């Protein structure tokens, strides 16, 4: 049987599906959300480094959705498949499919296994929505549909940047809250005398409000730094595919 395909077990209970790749075949539970590539990676890279961070998985789903919508808009994906895939991406981005991502964060291939985990799970979730059995890759294929015009080498770095941006926005909100709290104390303590210290020794008089004002300025500078970091992270290589020249991706 050709690589990257699956078939239901002839067993009358239909409790397994058989998936094939260039190495051979594996039996998976019929309702398993991932496929043969993820299962091989799960077995090969059981290194104990902890799971792939959920934030990265959720960010990767957003990248996959963007690619899906772009391919559909350009006519490269059937509309029903694109709609099912986009909805599946939303499920993962919302954190509703965490159990479908079993891989260790320490893995070979610079993210290839994680990319294939996303591709296979998204394909199966889309098949669920289309009323087809999981593993029916002739209907929704992990590579031919989910990973269309993409590579691990452009989607994985993009997902990392999206995850970093989302984390930075959490940090930005925290810095804003901290700055506001310090500024309120600056006003409340404006008339309270204090001693400024240098080298841990009493130095010159100041107010407690001035101390809190200085801390508020430090928080403001850190907030500005998060904004500048996000600006740089917005530049991504999506569309570059495997080596950056966009091979196998249409120019339109």
What are these regions (language model features)?
Residues 2-252:
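Conserved, well-structured ligand/cofactor-binding cores
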């Amino acid at each position: 049987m050709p690589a990257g395909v699956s078939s239901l077990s002839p067993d009358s209970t239909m409790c397994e599906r058989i998936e094939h790749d260039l190495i051979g075949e594996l039996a998976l539970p019929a309702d398993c959300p991932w496929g043969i590539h993820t299962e091989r990676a799960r077995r090969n890279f059981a290194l104990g480094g902890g799971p792939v961070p959920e934030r990265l998985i959720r960010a990767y789903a957003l990248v996959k959705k963007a690619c899906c919508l772009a391919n559909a808009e350009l006519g490269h994906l059937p509309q029903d498949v694109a709609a099912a895939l986009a909805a599946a991406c939303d499920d993962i981005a919302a954190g509703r499919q965490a159990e479908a991502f079993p891989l260790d964060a320490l893995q070979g291939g610079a993210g290839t296994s994680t990319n294939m985990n996303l591709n296979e799970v998204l394909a199966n979730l889309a098949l669920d929505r289309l009323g087809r059995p999981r593993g029916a890759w002739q209907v929704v294929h992990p590579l031919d549909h989910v990973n269309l015009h993409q590579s691990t080498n452009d989607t994985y770095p993009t997902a990392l940047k999206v995850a970093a941006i989302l984390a930075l926005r959490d940090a930005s909100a925290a810095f804003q809250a901290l700055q506001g709290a310090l500024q309120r104390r600056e006003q409340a303590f404006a008339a309270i005398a204090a001693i400024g210290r240098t080298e841990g020794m009493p130095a010159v008089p100041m107010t407690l409000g001035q101390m809190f004002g200085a801390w508020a300025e430090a928080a403001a500078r850190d907030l500005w730094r998060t904004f500048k970091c996000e600006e740089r992270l917005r530049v991504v290589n999506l569309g570059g595919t495997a080596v950056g020249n966009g091979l196998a991706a249409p120019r339109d």
